[in-house]
Structures are given as C-alpha cells and as structure tokens.
Amino acid sequence: MVDQNPKRSNEPPVWLMFSAGGMVSGLAFPVLILILGILLPFGIISPDNIIAFSHHWFGKLVILALTIFPMWAGLHRLHHGMHDIKVHVPNGGLIFYGLAAVYSFIVLFAVIAI
C-alpha cells in the first residue's frame, strides 16, 4: 500500500544547488581562468570590457551564477564529507546550508550594488 502522507525531504532543492555548482565550476571556471588569468594580463582583453560586462544585467547574472552555485556545491560537499569521516556536526544541515543561504543573499545585494 502507498503511504498517503510521505515524509518530505529538503534534499531535492539542495541537490539542485549542488549540481548547479558542480556544472558551473566544471564548465565556466576554465573559461574564467582563461579570460582573467591569461587574456587580461597579456592585454588581449581590455579591463574596460570586463567592467562594462559586470555592469550589464546579463553580466550580473553571470557573476551571481559563478559565485553562488559553487558555494552551495562546496558547502554541500563539506557537510557530507564530515559525515563520511564520522564527524557529525549537530544541526549540520542547518549550519552549512544556512551559511550558503546567507552567502547567497550577501552576494545578491553586492552584485545589485555594482
């Protein structure tokens, strides 16, 4: 018989943020390293272009994605890594995911202020 009142979990939204962070880290960071670590120092790209991009609405969305999602992925890995090595933090989910949420709001307001 099917349980009519299944227990709900907070894992699906957290896994969504975790997987988005992994994808952003894997796909966008090499490009970011190329642009900021190689092309910008050698003068191939002007700093004015990067500043103009960061002031555009699409640039702000990119900055948000490049900062918020990897933080969720990192704190999710840290939370589950602590369990793997048998270090159980009381209210660990609340602490780690709460830190990620606070960081997300701080970054959101900082990027809006650009």
UniProtKB/Swiss-Prot annotation:
Gene3D superfamilies xref list: Fumarate reductase/succinate dehydrogenase, transmembrane subunit
Name of the protein in its database record: Fumarate reductase subunit D
Record organism: Mannheimia succiniciproducens (strain KCTC 0769BP / MBEL55E)
Record bears the keyword Oxidoreductase: no
Family membership: Belongs to the FrdD family.
Subunit structure: Part of an enzyme complex containing four subunits: a flavoprotein (FrdA), an iron-sulfur protein (FrdB), and two hydrophobic anchor proteins (FrdC and FrdD).
Membrane-crossing residue ranges in chain numbering: 25-45, 50-70, 94-114
Record's subcellular location: Cell inner membrane
Job of this protein: Anchors the catalytic components of the fumarate reductase complex to the cell membrane, binds quinones.
Chain's gene name: frdD
